Swiss-Prot record:
Belongs to the ATPase A chain family. The chain crosses the membrane at residues 9-29, 68-88, 97-117, 138-158, 184-204. It is found in: Mitochondrion inner membrane. This is ATP synthase F(0) complex subunit a. Component of the ATP synthase complex composed at least of ATP5F1A/subunit alpha, ATP5F1B/subunit beta, ATP5MC1/subunit c (homooctomer), MT-ATP6/subunit a, MT-ATP8/subunit 8, ATP5ME/subunit e, ATP5MF/subunit f, ATP5MG/subunit g, ATP5MK/subunit k, ATP5MJ/subunit j, ATP5F1C/subunit gamma, ATP5F1D/subunit delta, ATP5F1E/subunit epsilon, ATP5PF/subunit F6, ATP5PB/subunit b, ATP5PD/subunit d, ATP5PO/subunit OSCP. Subunit a, of the mitochondrial membrane ATP synthase complex (F(1)F(0) ATP synthase or Complex V) that produces ATP from ADP in the presence of a proton gradient across the membrane which is generated by electron transport complexes of the respiratory chain. ATP synthase complex consist of a soluble F(1) head domain - the catalytic core - and a membrane F(1) domain - the membrane proton channel. These two domains are linked by a central stalk rotating inside the F(1) region and a stationary peripheral stalk.
Length: 226
């Protein structure tokens, strides 16, 4: 069956019902519950990675910011595992959907901004009026700063969506070219297959890095408001 280039990005359905919820919950099965933890190499590696990321992201925060540690660590695990599972053949990657990424970015961004206005009202309002600004430029700067503030969650979501989607499209195109060249030019097909393997390895790195960058930017937004 011939598939469209964007078939893998279509939300899967069963009996007329979307399966996105089940797909989103699936990564949680990869992490053992606390009563079944075994001190093996995999668990030790997960704990080391979580401690390293927590130290890098949360060391800049004060006590109020530290309360977000569990949420941010859960966020990076969820996005990272979802991105990596999406590299499996004939799988669906929820992070290629802008609506889902906006659903993650907007509440986290709004929570950080509301925290800032509650705890540091004057400092938060001061971001709209940089010190030393000439009086005629004040209205324009307030508008620009307001727009830049509301663009932050959109930038978070679009960045994650665009990078993951672009990687999947490249794999799809090169994989299709490899199959087409198999009967025409085996040597060229072998070269494209090697490129496909390298690109897949790069996609594993990209999926992990995008999860880190998304969570890090949320952490920085939180730092600016606590």
């Amino acid at each position: 069956m011939n598939e469209n280039l964007f078939t893998s990005f279509i939300t899967p359905m069963m009996l007329g019902l979307p399966l996105v919820t089940l797909i989103i919950l699936f990564p949680s099965l990869l992490f053992p519950s606390s009563n079944r933890l075994i001190n093996n190499r995999l668990v030790s590696l997960q704990q080391w990675a979580l401690q390293l990321m927590s130290k890098q992201m949360m060391s800049i925060h004060n006590t109020k910011g530290q309360t977000w540690t569990l949420m941010l660590m859960s966020l990076i695990l969820f996005i990272g595992s979802t991105n990596l599972l999406g590299l499996l053949p004939h799988s669906f990657t929820p992070t290629t959907q802008l609506s889902m990424n906006l659903g993650m970015a907007i509440p986290l961004w709004a929570g950080a901004v509301i925290t800032g206005f509650r705890n540091k009202t004057k400092a938060s309002l001061a971001h709209f009026y940089p010190q030393g600004t000439p009086t005629p430029l004040i209205p324009m700067l307030v508008i620009i700063e307001t727009i830049s503030l509301f663009i932050q969650p959109m930038a978070l979501a679009v960045r994650l969506t665009a990078n993951i989607t672009a990687g999947h499209l490249l794999i799809h195109l090169i994989g299709g070219a490899t199959l087409a060249l198999t009967s025409i030019s085996p040597t060229t097909a072998l070269i494209t297959f090697i490129i496909l393997i390298l690109l897949t390895i790069l996609e594993f790195e990209l999926g992990t890095r995008e999860a880190y960058v998304f969570t890090l930017l949320v952490s920085l937004y939180l730092h600016d408001n606590t």
